Design a protein with these regions (language model features):
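Catalytic-core regions of core metabolic enzymes
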Residues: 1-479
Length: 479
């Protein structure tokens, strides 16, 4: 579906959010298991609408089969009760819809229809007027649907059943209002969804609306979710562009992969992981590797900068936690730093330690770019906030590899800390295009190299110009 996006919406009922649900899924042939964030990312990337429950899938199908496309992700919420409107607005917001203030001209027109006590900013509150004068329902819907900044309208309340709480004469007026509402909705060609507590009952008004394919829901939340589904369907991704940024030398790449440590797991230690990234055109900061106090002195002199110096050994996956990293080391102190790290290595059984030294990076936003192979979806790329607390913060997003620039930019916008990438508190914006370039190249690496099971680049300092990779490692698949 990434290569050939469907012109028709696709809904998949995918349960399994709980551990017990995943266990049950695994007990059936052909069950689709997998880490839920990866499933959600894959479906979103392919334009698939995911439903966690059968009723949710049914509600989505009704909306998509009945409604015209939602051209804007903005809705007006009309209600004959403030509580109803609040729930609809909250649910709409949580599912990616905006409920913006209506244009001044739209509000003026609404004030001409509704009593002074009514709210007209969005949501619109009838304040009891519709139960006395049902004709206001199609008139207000007409005004809201005519607003060019509004994509669709959700009505929440008791419409369709006013006859049950009033006189038969009011019921006849409500039926006439329903027929007028049908004409209004058809005339504007925008989605209109009705929430009513009487949904499912055999009432004349509701039968009129059903005959006109206006979807009706008894649940406030379902009404808002149904409109959100229309927006997701309208925002389906286009085909993956397929253009590459990287042109790696495969002979060089194979030589780098051959440096993996023996045993299980097979590790590509930081120097080789950096070389692998460089082979894919990633801008890797200059570094040197040394194995003695003498060689580190020469290497430090070449770099002409204060240094980060790190032990390189398969036993040290998390070097900082093991005391295997020294920061902000003056070049003339490099030999002392080596001896300190060598003593630390000896204390944990590493006899002939190597160290990597690279210029310090003391500024920039710490991010992470990672990748792994999902058993269901294949290579997956991750981006988010990085650093030593990356797992605790868990502000990350995922995409299937390979991906293009548009998909990579979308990843940046999905993390909770997205605003930190822009200008913030007097600080210049980060170079997001450099982050996009890194994400795309990593995705191409993962799509090319089946041998690479995991790749962890953390932290990646996102600078005002460019990126600076501070650490990298890879795990290769077992042979």
């Amino acid at each position: 579906m990434r290569r050939h996006p469907s012109p028709k919406p696709v809904i998949i009922l995918k349960p399994g959010d709980t551990e017990s649900g995943r266990r049950a899924a695994l007990s059936h042939t052909g069950a689709l298991a997998g880490e839920q964030r990866v499933v959600d990312a894959a479906f979103r990337q392919c334009g698939i609408i995911r439903a966690a429950e059968s009723e949710e899938a049914w509600d989505a199908a009704i909306a998509l089969a009945s409604l015209p496309p939602l051209r804007r992700g903005t809705v007006a919420v009309i209600s004959d009760g403030g509580g109803h409107a609040t729930i609809v607005c909250d649910t709409a917001d949580r599912h990616g819809l905006a409920v913006p203030p209506l244009a001044p001209d739209t509000q003026r027109r609404l004030r001409e229809i509704l009593p002074a006590r009514s709210g007209v900013g969005n949501p619109i509150d009838f304040a009891g007027q519709a139960e006395e004068e049902p004709e206001v329902v199609p008139r207000v819907a007409d005004v809201c649907l005519a607003d060019p900044d509004i994509g669709g309208v959700i009505f929440a309340g008791h419409f369709g059943g006013y006859v049950k709480i009033a006189t038969p004469e009011l019921g006849l007026r409500e039926e006439a209002a329903a027929r007028e509402l049908v004409d209004v909705v058809r005339g504007h060609g925008k989605p209109f969804i009705l929430h009513t507590i009487y949904a499912g009952e055999r009432l004349p008004v509701l039968e009129t609306l059903a005959a006109a394919s206006i979807p009706m829901y008894r649940s406030l939340e379902a009404s808002a979710k149904a409109m959100a589904v229309c927006w997701r369907a309208a925002s389906r991704p286009r085909a993956h562009e397929g253009r590459r940024r990287s042109t790696p030398d495969r002979v060089r790449v194979d030589a780098i992969l051959s440096q993996a440590t023996p045993g299980t797991p097979r590790l590509l230690l930081e120097p080789d992981a950096r070389e692998l990234l460089a082979a894919y055109g990633v801008n890797v900061p200059v570094f040197r590797v040394a194995a003695t106090a003498e060689t580190i002195t020469h290497a430090a002199g070449d770099l002409h900068a204060r240094l980060a110096i790190k032990l390189v050994a398969p036993e040290l996956v998390h070097k900082s936690e093991a005391g295997g990293v020294l920061l902000d080391v003056a070049p003339e102190k490099a030999a002392d730093a080596y001896r300190q790290l060598a003593a630390r290595a000896a204390s944990i059984g590493i006899a002939k330690p190597r160290v990597l030294l690279t210029p310090m990076v003391s500024h920039g936003l710490e991010t992470v770019v990672g990748a792994f192979r999902d058993p269901q979806f294949g290579p997956v790329v991750m981006f988010g906030l990085g650093g030593i607390d990356v797992e605790a913060i868990a502000d990350v997003t995922f995409r299937l590899a390979p991906l293009d620039e548009t998909e990579a930019r979308a990843m940046l916008s999905e993390i909770r800390a997205y605003r930190l990438l822009g200008a913030h508190r007097g600080r210049a914006p980060r170079d997001t295009e450099a982050a996009v370039d890194l994400i795309v190249r990593v995705s191409e690496l993962m799509a090319d190299l089946d041998d690479v099971a995991e790749l962890d680049i953390n932290p990646v300092f996102l600078l005002e110009r460019g990126t600076a990779i501070a650490d990298a490692r890879a795990v290769l698949s077992a042979r």
